[in-house]
C-alpha cells in the first residue's frame, strides 16, 4: 500500500507541472506576521482551559521556531521574546525529572547558550540531563508500563528530548549525552516505527488499530514531531559520528512516506492515511513536514525534484491558512491521536512549526 501511494504521488507531481514559488519578501512578511501574533498573544488562545507555565512543552516548540526564524531572518523580536522568558524563569526546566516534555524548553536554552555563552543558560538543562543519565528510568519502553512516560515511549518525545542531548554533547564536548540519546532513540524507534509504512505509531496503544477506511492509525502531528526531530538531529550531529547514517536512513525513509501522504492542495491531515474521515488540513503537522522537506532539499539529502515541489506546495498551503493578523488556523489541539480541526483552532506549536518551515523555505 505504501509503495503504491508513493508511486502515485510521484506520477501526480510529475504531471502537475506546479511551478516552484520563489521565496522572498512575501514569505518573510508572512513569517514575521505569524511570529508577532504569537508574541502579542502569548498565553492566550490555549486549546485546554487554565493557565500554562512558560516551561510547557508546547511553548518549547514555539521557542525553537522563534529562534530558528530569528537566526535566518534577523527578526529581533523573536530572540528578544525567548530571551525574556528564559531570564524571568531562571532558565529552569519543567518539574518532572524524567518526562521528555519537561526538558523540551532546554532546546531554546542551549540554542541561546551557543550564541551568548552565558553559564546561567546552560546550568539547569545540564543538571537535568546529568541526573537522568546518572539515574536512568527503570521501566519498560511502553506507554502503559508503570511509569512508562519516564522513557520515550510515545513518538512526540523524540522531538522533545533528543535534540537537547545532542546539543549538550556539542556544547560540552561530552559524548555521554549523545550515547544516552542514541540508546533511547533506538529503543523508542524499534517499538514505534512501522518500517513497512515508513511512519511512527503515536504509542503502543495504536498497534493493530485501524481508521474508518481500514488503514493503520498514524497521527499527523505525531509523525511531524518525529520527522522534524530527525532533521534537527542530522543538523546537530557531526557527519563523522558513527550514528549519523542511522538518522539519515530514517530521515530518507520517512521522506518518501511524508510526500506520499500530502494532499492535492499541499497539506497534511490529522490522520496520515485517512483523509476521508479527516478531510481538513492540520497545520502543525504540515509545518513540521514542510520544514523537514525543505531542510532536506537545502542540505542536499533530498535531491529528487518531487521533494522540492512538495516543500513548496506545503508552504503555499500553510500560508493560505494565515489570517491578516498572523494567526495560523487549522492547528489540532493538544492530544495524542487524529482529531478534526477548523479555521479557528490554533496553538503555539503550530506557530513554531510554521516558523521552522519558513526558516528553510526562504533559503530553498
Residue ranges and their predicted role:
Residues 79-83, 91-206, 212-216, 325:
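Extended ligand-binding groove/face enriched in aromatic
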Residues 60-63, 106, 159-162, 224-227, ...:
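Membrane-embedded glycan transfer/ligation machinery
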Residues 23, 27-37, 64, 68, ...:
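Charged/polar interaction segments and conserved charged motifs
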Residues 9-11, 23-60, 67-68, 72-79, ...:
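CBM-like carbohydrate-recognition segments
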Residues 19, 50, 93, 113, ...:
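Short amphipathic alpha-helical segments at helix-loop
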Residues 15-17, 71, 235:
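Hydrophobic alpha-helical membrane context
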Residues 1-24:
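Bacterial Sec-dependent N-terminal signal peptides
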Residues 155-159, 163-272, 279-290, 302-331, ...:
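Extended ligand-binding clefts on enzyme/binding-domain cores
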